[in-house]
Amino acid sequence: MSFSVASRVSYFGTTIFAEMTQLAIQHNAINLSQGFPDFDGPSDVKAAAIAAVEAGQNQYAPPNGQPDLRRAIAVHAQRFYGQAVNSDTEITVTSGATEALFAAVTGLINPGHEVVIFEPFYDSYVPDVIMAGGVPRFVPLRPVKHALRERSVEGAQPVLSDSEGSKDAIDWVFDPDELAAAFNNRTRAIIVNTPHNPTGKVYSQAELETIAGLCQRWNVIAISDEVYEHIVFSGVQHVRLAQLPGMAERTVTISSQGKTFSFTGWKIGWAIAPPDLTLGVRRTHQFITFASSTPMQAAAAYALALDDEYYSTLAADYQHKRDFLAAVLRDAGLHVSIPDGTYFIMAGIAPLGFDDDVAFCRYLTTEIGVAAIPPSAFYSDEHKSLGQAYARFAFCKKQETLERAAERLMRLKKQ
């Protein structure tokens, strides 16, 4: 006898991250697919976690989060964005940003509500909406060539060359009219991810103002996923959506310590929202995980207070890794889209004779020994073709790991 899964999850399969990681393990490939560092974050942050354990902070934390961490999150919001946040009523600590996303969607979306989602999207967005009974409305980010901006790419010309030899760079942009058409009286929320996984796009102030205007016109909640907030390059500024006029009262801002401090396994995230929206997050959170790891919360509070040098060095180190991998991918024959943020690079595979990202990533893993992610997994069926011409590579790795990957990627030139 066998049993079927619940209908609400029958739509879902194994995540592409799990699939590609398993394939990488089977073929002893270097894993540039999943976005986790192969190095630890700051040693003093680890020491803070150990000290918390040894001090006996090993029982349940308050469901909404340890007061010290909530205060640290509030101070961080003021320090970097000038955002005044009440740590008692407007901050909820969760087991990673993914739980914060689920809690926000589940706690604020009713069956039949529509949720606008940009694609490509982080792969939990759509399942979250569907499990809440919501209806996703997709708006694609399309790759558009534009005049070259100044970029620093070590060891390579900072340009993208198409088959005709023209020199252009790529932006991933939405059509404002297409976005406006996605809003209606059934629209309850929009999910915005900036800096954006997988494209590396950092939404401009003007783009965020367009989004904000539609949210206010249609009385829509914004769920802003900002986990890569401190990983931006070349003087590009990350603008928090809640900073814009009229948006603080309708925005759930989500972030975590995993990306900023390189401890993805600790799973400490948070949601900042006005009290009425926080209520929905907290009512859901209490019945998912109830509370998050107590000693890891103590360490996260310590980490958030690190000096400005830590944050600037983080971005500079990742920019160096970005530049190295971009040069390697270009030299290997791929068409590179230089990211302004995150630790991912989207690379066009057409110059290598591929038009199917899944086939390419499987070939790359099994034959070349480097794993990447096929980004078509981050699109709806309607727009899946937009992702099939690319592969996503993660550069959140030790330099020696990237150099070993580079040696293998050079085999592509010989194919």
Question: Can you describe what each PLM-predicted range is?
Answer:
Residues 2-5, 10-27, 36-52, 64, ...:
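PLP-dependent class I/II
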Residues 32, 55-59, 72-79:
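Glycine-rich loop-to-alpha-helix module at the N-terminal edge of alpha/beta enzyme cores
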